[in-house]
Swiss-Prot record:
Predominant cellular place of this UniProt entry's protein: membrane
GO biological process: G protein-coupled acetylcholine receptor signaling pathway; negative regulation of signal transduction; positive regulation of GTPase activity; regulation of dopamine receptor signaling pathway
Protein name: Regulator of G-protein signaling 8
Membrane topology, record value: Peripheral membrane protein
SMART domains: RGS
């Protein structure tokens, strides 16, 4: 048991294979050239910049999986999808799905929110609007920005990716 737990706690340090979030092998040679060192460096400038970049988002998701806390980004992404829904019936269905998966106290991927926020969100979702999840989404975003994001920037995943893009750019310019 101790050995297993030791492996789990070291998991985020042992990840150097970025194949999880890079394109399939046949597409890497052309697509990964688009991932510049400047782009990867900018991810450290702000959480918004990281999330707005598809490779940055994928790298962050991979990192959160190594920390067993990917429910936060998955919830945030589900909320982003929810905001795009126009049909009231589809909105109600998606709201219920999000509530059951992330917000309910018995949710399989429960996000860490306070009781008041949980109850207010539950009440807002009785008659969902495109903005019903804004408050809880903002709280989860803030939690990731203040907690997970700084750890990601210091992580081996990010540092290795930064180093790989530096090496690639140096080789390319020679």
């Amino acid at each position: 048991m101790k050995t297993r737990l030791g492996c789990l706690s070291n998991k985020s340090d042992s990840c150097s294979d970025f194949s999880e979030f890079l394109p399939p092998a046949q597409e890497r040679t052309t697509r990964c050239l688009k991932l510049s060192n400047d782009e990867v460096t900018r991810w450290a400038d702000s959480f918004d910049i990281l999330l707005s970049n598809k490779y940055g988002l994928a790298a962050f998701r991979t990192f959160l999986k190594t920390e067993f806390s990917d429910e936060n980004i998955e919830f945030w992404l589900a909320c982003e999808d929810y905001k795009k829904i126009k049909s009231p019936a589809k909105m109600m269905s998606k709201a219920n799905k999000i509530y059951k998966e992330f917000i309910d106290v018995h949710a399989p991927r429960e996000v860490n929110i306070d009781h008041r926020t949980r109850e207010e969100t539950k009440n807002r979702l009785l008659e969902p609007t495109p903005h019903s999840l804004n408050e809880v989404q903002a709280k989860v975003y803030s939690l990731m920005e203040k907690d997970s994001y700084p750890r990601f920037i210091r992580s081996k995943i990010y540092q290795d990716l930064l180093n790989r893009t530096q090496i690639y750019c140096q080789r390319k310019s020679v």
